[in-house]
């Protein structure tokens, strides 16, 4: 698992998102007080807690040498990438029109870090099929599904 994807780093990013949502307003109301945004935030928070528990389970398996943790790592990697993309997307939505800014602007929040990180995780999800590869590994190793057939002549 990449340091950038660790549950602790994601927790720090979630805390920054909460601060952002407390400061941004839509129609004079704080974003964090709007139910649709708060529901999305709580969903992300719950998924992060599950990811933190899985990371501890992996660590415990490695320390106690109980079982191979490679499959659990693949699941955490897949979930972590999707979670971070969703977290960054919520921040962009919370900023409203300012969330669409990407480069130099006097209104840019956090020097565009939310937008850049959103695009980074989008790249991990679709670039080279990274998430699809993780899903294939999980389906083949955990569920015992057959491997994808190889195309002749490719």
Describe every region a protein language model picked out.
Residues 1:
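Sequence context surrounding c-type heme c attachment/ligation sites in exported
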Residues 4-154:
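Alpha-helical interface subdomain recognition
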């Amino acid at each position: 698992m990449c340091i950038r994807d660790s549950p602790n780093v994601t927790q720090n990013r979630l805390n920054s998102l909460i601060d952002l949502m407390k400061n941004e307003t839509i129609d004079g109301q704080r974003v964090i007080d709007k139910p649709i945004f708060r529901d999305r935030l709580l969903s992300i928070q719950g998924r992060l807690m599950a990811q933190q528990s899985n990371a501890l389970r992996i660590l415990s398996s490695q320390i106690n040498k109980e079982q191979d943790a490679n499959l659990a790592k693949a699941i955490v990697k897949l979930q972590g990438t999707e979670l971070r993309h969703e977290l960054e997307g919520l921040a962009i939505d919370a900023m409203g029109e300012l969330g669409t800014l990407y480069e130099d602007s006097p209104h840019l929040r956090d020097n565009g870090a939310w937008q850049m990180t959103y695009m980074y995780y989008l790249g991990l999800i679709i670039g080279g099929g990274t998430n699809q590869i993780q899903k294939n590994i999980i389906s083949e190793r955990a569920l015992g599904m057959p491997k994808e057939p190889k195309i002749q002549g490719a």
